[in-house]
């Protein structure tokens, strides 16, 4: 029997099958899901910003450039093989825009771009993503199957 494990904002969790990882409220944030399909272990990070920059200390799960290393380390501790890791992501919306004015800061785009940079650096293929738009998402990640269910208001639900 599976448990649903909630991942909060600027948080990350790892688990083994048959558990499900879930995060809600993905606007400009990214939900990045990484798993090993053979060992059936994986994790999810709810990333808020692209880089930690010069911010000392703080929460490494908040930033794409620091969360990815931590997420992979924790998944490997569960018995995953780095060579088998695969990723999926969702989120990265442009939540605040005003007619006739340029998008403010484009945090969603920058978050998605930085996650891709980090995945390439780590040698982890991104299998599929559901990013962009102007709507929020809630995601459920099955670490056993690798299925990522993406739910949105007014845009339906899909499994990627």
UniProtKB/Swiss-Prot annotation:
Q: What EC number is given for this enzyme?
A: 3.5.1.44
MF-aspect GO terms: protein-glutamine glutaminase activity
Entry keywords, A to Z: Chemotaxis, Hydrolase
Instruction: Kindly state which reaction or reactions the protein catalyses.
Output: L-glutaminyl-[protein] + H2O = L-glutamyl-[protein] + NH4(+)
UniProt key word Disulfide bond: no
Q: What class of enzyme is it?
A: hydrolase
Question: Could you tell me the Gene Ontology terms of the biological process aspect for this record?
Answer: chemotaxis
Tell whether Zinc-finger is among the UniProt keywords. Answer: no
PANTHER family in alphabetical order: CHEMORECEPTOR GLUTAMINE DEAMIDASE CHED-RELATED
So what family is this one in?
Belongs to the CheD family.
Biological role: Probably deamidates glutamine residues to glutamate on methyl-accepting chemotaxis receptors (MCPs), playing an important role in chemotaxis.
The identity of this protein, by name, is: Probable chemoreceptor glutamine deamidase CheD
- Gene name, please? cheD
